[in-house]
Amino acid sequence: MPASSVRLPLRLLTLAGLLALAGAAALARGAPQGGPPSPQGGPAPTAAPARGPTLFVLVGDGSARFVFQLGGLGALNDTRIRGHLLGRYLVSYQVVPPPVSAWYFVQRPRERPRLSGPPSGAELVAFDAPGVRRTYTTAAVWPAEVAVLADAEARCPAAVFNVTLGEAFLGLRVALRSFLPLEVIISAERMRMIAPPALGADLEPPGPPAGRFHVYTLGFLSDGAMHQTMRDVAAYVHESDDYLAQLSAAHAAALAAVVQPGPYYFYRAAVRLGVAAFVFSEAARRDRRASAPALLRVESDARLLSRLLMRAAGCPAGFAGLFDGRAERVPVAPADQLRAAWTFGEDPAPRLDLARATVAEAYRRSVRGKPFDQQALFFAVALLLRAGGPGDARETLLRTTAMCTAERAAAAAELTRAALSPTAAWNEPFSLLDVLSPCAVSLRRDLGGDATLANLGAAARLALAPAGAPGAAAATDGGAEEEEEDPVARAAPEIPAEALLALPLRGGASFVFTRRRPDCGPAYTLGGVDIANPLVLALVSNDSAACDYTDRMPESQHLPATDNPSVCVYCDCVFVRYSSAGTILETVLIESKDMEEQLMAGANSTIPSFNPTLHGGDVKALMLFPNGTVVDLLSFTSTRLAPVSPAYVVASVVGAAITVGILYALFKMLCSFSSEGYSRLINARS
């Protein structure tokens, strides 16, 4: 017989005995059974003063919870009832050891600046509170009746993460197999703790002094770190009443949890996410309206961050939805269509053209050193890798790899360091996607620390799956959902694990840079490179029958410049710069005639990667052709000037004409003066 079927009768017997003991104790005192507490957790109604408060006991082993009414708190003095309360299948109510005064804060934290303004414009949506009220139960605090605005839960055998949003109420619970449980309650009303008689029947749960809200943190004092965590997270709601500032802090904490897995950042990121949703819902509830882009942002971030946090707990689960379908009914602005498609798992086919255009525009701006929307790029890459064809996926990875420069990797590393700082104040909007895009969704692995890159890459691959797709929602108690295949590995399966950088081609092969020769494929050893950091360029493919073990040297050539304005000879080629130290500086996919002309312009090029005057003498260039040819590029046979605009030509012609006119006028003046002067001299002599 299964163990679960044995536990059920035992549980029923335990409950029956518990209720019998409670009834016997009540009869012995001659007191009638008490009624439930008020919804605010205050004293019992004055209509029955003799009854006293009622004890609610939560029964269960984690998979289910039941609430039973017992007699008054006086029943706790009965040693038999106390034994049942502390039994295996019931929860202990004594979760906060004395002295309770050690849990309270001395001062409130400093409030941070606002990052977002009040909702305005035509994109407003109604945000009315529902009429449904529900009892919020917990193991340590008297039940409270809450008008629920949103409820989300991610669950698997390894962890449970629950967020309940109500009118001026937040209940957040994290129960993990690997970490100690933590619960945070934010309420406009004072709540009462279920406590032993020695601590008093009207004891407030631990938390900081009441500000705009009462904040309570419940957990186990395992060590000083857990104590400090509970004190820190209790201060979050009073730091800022701006949801965007709270979301930025949640993204920073989630980034830290991804880079350095463990309970320290996990707790902080989970509570930040809940507080951000609470601050947003409170503002929307007060205004009875919300900005559609803001609602979509909170919904998508909740699904993204919950998935990353649950994965850190060993669970392939995430919130299936936060605001119970509200966000799915809002109007979506053109700039948010890719985010909405990712968030709700919509059919990506109508959005593929927009995704391709987004990647192409981001690449064009990146090549010219201009900023681009990294978050929109991430959602576009996610759609193309999941729903685009093999050509879409490989070309997308080729572009994101080219966009991942050393400068962007350094900027992402700086954001990561700031996220790991507990004192960082996010005065500007920040998103984890600003770090993951484009480098973490590329095939470049030579920038940054190995552990950091591996963790960011794993987070990016997890985040690429649409939030509304099967397997991205919460798993059941019967077992976790199977993990989806890595979309990056699926798009380019031929790339070896030791590759520093890979450039996928359309035919199923890829150029890869490594420190040692791969097992298969023609390999080019790049000369003039530090022997401590050798660079090997190989052409690899999945076709083992055509495996070539030839070792070659790239041929140094002066490539011919093209004069045909309608034919792009070097389109689909990849331009690579590397240094003698064995560092790959940049890669550029030549995708248009304009880019080809900039490449051949040499020192006159306006694209920094192509301009040789911006690089030192130890920097060399390669040209990689789609057919697998590798050329050590010296120069082009003729230098072509970068194309100039018609306005510049017209201005030059007009300027030249004016200059000629001025010179002619000066010449006439000089000639006239000389002729007149000679005439006077002749007349004087005569």
From Swiss-Prot:
Glycosylation sites: 77, 162, 542, 604, 627
Subcellular location: Virion membrane; Host cell membrane; Host endosome membrane
Transmembrane feature ranges: 647-667
UniProt keyword annotations, A-Z: Fusion of virus membrane with host cell membrane, Fusion of virus membrane with host membrane, Glycoprotein, Host cell membrane, Host endosome, Host membrane, Membrane, Sialic acid, Signal, Transmembrane, Transmembrane helix, Viral envelope protein, Viral penetration into host cytoplasm, Virion, Virus entry into host cell
UniProt PTM: N-glycosylated, O-glycosylated, and sialylated.
Topology versus the membrane: Single-pass type I membrane protein
GO biological process: fusion of virus membrane with host plasma membrane; symbiont entry into host cell
Family annotation (Gene3D superfamilies): 1.20.58.1340, 3.30.500.50, Herpesvirus glycoprotein H, C-terminal domain
InterPro entries named in the record: Herpes_gH (IPR003493), Herpes_glycoH_C (IPR035305), Herpes_glycoH_C_sf (IPR038172)
Topology Intravirion: residue spans: 668-686
Signal peptide: 1-24
GO CC terms of this entry: host cell endosome membrane; host cell plasma membrane; membrane; viral envelope; virion membrane
Annotated region (Interaction with gL), positions in chain: 157-217
Organism superkingdom: Viruses
Primary site of residence: virion
Virion surface side: 25-646
Assembly information from the UniProt record: Interacts with glycoprotein L (gL); this interaction is necessary for the correct processing and cell surface expression of gH. The heterodimer gH/gL seems to interact with gB trimers during fusion.
Entry similarity comment: Belongs to the herpesviridae glycoprotein H family.
Biological role: The heterodimer glycoprotein H-glycoprotein L is required for the fusion of viral and plasma membranes leading to virus entry into the host cell. Following initial binding to host receptor, membrane fusion is mediated by the fusion machinery composed of gB and the heterodimer gH/gL. May also be involved in the fusion between the virion envelope and the outer nuclear membrane during virion morphogenesis.
Protein name: Envelope glycoprotein H
Taxonomic lineage: Viruses, Duplodnaviria, Heunggongvirae, Peploviricota, Herviviricetes
